[in-house]
């Protein structure tokens, strides 16, 4: 097969591993910077061009689209879909996952466990919002944040009010969530491919930090998931409509709660911690599922 990888940098670990895995199975691979792709949006013959040449003959596309280029990246992916190329993750599903509020609303509607979460626009509603999420300590999150950036732990009510007012003053959209203290600064990253959890790791925040993201200096180790945690991860991926994703879960006193569904999860941490060839599993998924014009808009909302 001929496989395209949408990635800004061919040297990144995840991109390199996907290239290696695909080529090891005899596939032709081309890494494309999505920002260098341009499109002819025509009903008779939609096309994509890259550095002056028309892109043709691709059987599948693997989107590795960073949060900062979601709009243009998903537009390029959508054009591949219009051309009948099989997407590992569909553009609409990536858009759902990138909108934290939308994804939480969809997960809530389907009964997936979540931390108590509030959302408001007016500073006049801060008191009521804090009451809804059971007061401090609580977590304030920027809707557009990634890799732990824009996530603040407010340990007192006064601190919470100050942080929320500051973000609102900057016209930033924020979520306010309960702080799951019993998680102890750890979370679970469950890697889902084709409706199955193929690998998992437990991430632990560094000393003095509550965010367990590896980009924030956290550490990772292999972990054994409970059946309920495994089922929660699979259901979350299905609700958002992602074939390949990382589902982040906290172990709370009332069961597993999902804090994020990542549409473009990194491979280095999960492969190192679990010892699983995740890149190879993604290529196997493509081999088993890629067919022309097989884009069906999975999930709803």
UniProtKB/Swiss-Prot annotation:
Mn(2+) 1 binds at residues 248, 260. Pfam families: RimK, Rimk_N. Mg(2+) 2 binds at residues 260, 262. One of its GO terms (biological process) is protein modification process. Mg(2+) 1 binds at residues 248, 260. Mn(2+) 2 binds at residues 260, 262. One of its GO terms (molecular function) is ribosomal S6-glutamic acid ligase activity. Residues 104-287 form the ATP-grasp domain. One of its GO terms (cellular component) is cytoplasm. Its cofactor is Mg(2+); Mn(2+). SUPFAM superfamilies: Glutathione synthetase ATP-binding domain-like (SSF56059). It comes from the Bacteria. ATP binds at residues 141, 178-179, 187, 211-213. Its EC number is 6.3.2.-. Keywords: ATP-binding, Ligase, Magnesium, Manganese, Metal-binding, Nucleotide-binding, Protein biosynthesis. Binds 2 magnesium or manganese ions per subunit. Belongs to the RimK family. NCBIfam families: PRK10446.1, rimK_fam. This is Probable alpha-L-glutamate ligase. The lineage of its organism: Bacteria, Pseudomonadati, Pseudomonadota, Gammaproteobacteria, Chromatiales.
